[in-house]
Design a protein with these regions (language model features):
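Extracellular/periplasmic head regions of type IV pilus-like filament subunits
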Residues: 68-142, 156
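Short, contiguous, well-ordered secondary-structure segments
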Residues: 35, 66-67
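N-terminal single-pass transmembrane signal-anchor helix
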Residues: 17-45
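Aliphatic-rich helix starts adjacent to a transmembrane/signal segment
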Residues: 44-63
Length: 157
């Protein structure tokens, strides 16, 4: 039995340390690779462009909403747009309550649309960021906006 005990004790490594684990260099290399991959992914995704595209999508939706409200007003009034601000402008005018703007809000809100849409970046109640023009020859109305990625944004009906 003594021989067995001696063999066990001799096999024990007193004073030696284990080789398990990672060295500092290995950890730094892995962190460097992760940083490079993260940089490539961020550049590929381009968050600024993604946000700009999201705002342009909102502009497309708002332009369609305004044009639908104008169309519904015209349907209810036998093909004529009825508004206290007067007939639809035949030259391009910005929508809003400002001095040189066409104030369409009282004519379509809340009957045809719940709230007057405003540009997601710069729109205010005095200058919504959306414009309107009516062509009496073709009887078509165009509502538009300035986009960030897609420029211009406009819908004609």
């Amino acid at each position: 039995m003594t021989k067995f005990k001696n063999k066990i004790l001799m096999g024990a490594s007193v004073g030696r340390y284990s080789d398990a684990g990672f060295t500092l260099i290995e950890l730094l290399v892995v962190i460097g690779i992760i940083a490079i991959l993260a940089g490539v992914v961020i550049v590929a995704i381009n968050p600024a462009r993604q946000f700009a595209q999201a705002r342009d999508t909102q502009r497309w939706s708002n332009v369609n909403s305004i044009l639908n409200a104008i169309g519904q007003n015209m349907v209810d009034n036998h093909g004529n747009f009825t508004c206290g601000a007067g007939a639809l402008p035949t030259t391009t005018m910005e929508l809003g309550s400002g001095a040189n703007n066409y104030n369409i809000e009282p004519c379509i809100v809340p009957t045809y649309i719940s709230v007057m849409p405003m540009d997601p970046s710069t729109g205010t109640s005095t200058a919504t960021g959306y414009s309107v023009v009516y062509d009496p020859t073709t009887r078509r109305t165009t509502v538009g906006a300035t986009g960030e990625v897609t420029n211009p944004i406009s819908v004609t009906r």
